[in-house]
Amino acid sequence: MTASPSSAEGSSGLPDRPKLVLASASPRRLSLLEQIGIVPDAVVSADIDEEPRPGELPRPLAQRLARQKAEHVAAQRTDAALVLGADTVVSVGRRVLPKAEDEKTARACLKLLSGRRHKVLTAVVLRPSAGWPQGTPCERLVETSVIFHRLTDAQIDALIAQGDWQGKAGGYAIQGAAAAHIRQIGGSYSAVVGLPLFETAQLLRGQPVGKPSGGWIA
């Protein structure tokens, strides 16, 4: 029987290619990976504290959380694995907007974002497990500028009623009803959804994998 690419062993006793593990419970990130033909071998939720530290700025926050997610899951793996972690932070200036868990928070976020520019910072991190010593730790941070038009109270009410703000940083989902109110985006659309696809593909292309198996993406 022919072994799968992630389990076929080379002369070193290690597989030609490690398992790819997505350290996220987000269906959006899984869907984005599948969009470019990448299907993780495992999807594991990273149970970490995502609260910003006192005085922590948006960029360092996104980077720290993405690293912690990847490192938390990588530390639990004893097999040859490469763990992909990501985190998205929405900010207005130096202010980090929360993930909206209730209507009051979502409404406050939308009122703040109405008619103004904000930034979406998405960090993506690759961390090898101890069982894949030749893996290369690497990461990218992608910054995207987004501008909402000026929202009326009725439009905010309609967005709240849609319900796709739940659990979203900044209280909206760009792939949902909010798209009708976004006047301009500068940067990576997929990063705003939750995973910058170009940068993620670049990181994966840079990983050392065996020639017989090839990488995850051309």
UniProtKB/Swiss-Prot annotation:
Q: Which residues form the active site?
A: D87 (proton acceptor)
Q: Which InterPro entries match?
A: ITPase-like_fam (IPR029001), Maf-like (IPR003697)
The GO cellular component terms are: cytoplasm
Quote the EC number.
3.6.1.9
Q: So which cofactors does this thing need?
A: a divalent metal cation
PANTHER family on file: BIFUNCTIONAL DTTP/UTP PYROPHOSPHATASE/METHYLTRANSFERASE PROTEIN-RELATED, BIFUNCTIONAL DTTP_UTP PYROPHOSPHATASE_METHYLTRANSFERASE PROTEIN-RELATED
**What family is this protein classified in?**
Belongs to the Maf family. YhdE subfamily.
Q: What name does UniProt use for this protein? A: dTTP/UTP pyrophosphatase
Q: Tell me the lineage of the source organism.
A: Bacteria, Pseudomonadati, Pseudomonadota, Alphaproteobacteria, Acetobacterales
